[in-house]
């Protein structure tokens, strides 16, 4: 079941028209940042920054939704992943929450096709190997509880991160 819904690709998340929503690895102030966040803000245009300013912010492990503006997607779901320090400050739990809350919000809005970046594994320094496992197991758990909720849960990754996710996904499907 999962193989038909959870997919991984290497590419640019701002250029995925086949999904209704993309997820932004946001900062808590919902301002334009670097990496994926910066690319999403640039591609969406200045109206996104205005809507985010009106929302006011988002706590770590939570999610909010905006319009997609100039992106080929109807919505952007903004979620804040944890900054990684020692791994002993509930980072794994908070990262799982960021993914879960994004899926929950998308499901509540009737979104059937969603694309994620790898949350917190860039400038927030979450180990990619552990982050991939958390991302994929959280999606699997969500689908187990809500089997008909999504047609596609896509991870759009850079080449290096894609290789790690692909290996983790392969191992998870063997269990």
UniProtKB/Swiss-Prot annotation:
<dbReference type="InterPro" id="IPR002589">
    <property type="entry name" value="Macro_dom"/>
</dbReference>
<feature type="domain" description="Macro">
    <location>
        <begin position="1"/>
        <end position="173"/>
    </location>
</feature>
<comment type="similarity">
    <text>Belongs to the MacroD-type family.</text>
</comment>
<dbReference type="InterPro" id="IPR043472">
    <property type="entry name" value="Macro_dom-like"/>
</dbReference>
<dbReference type="Pfam" id="PF01661">
    <property type="entry name" value="Macro"/>
</dbReference>
<protein>
    <recommendedName>
        <fullName>Uncharacterized protein FN1951</fullName>
    </recommendedName>
</protein>
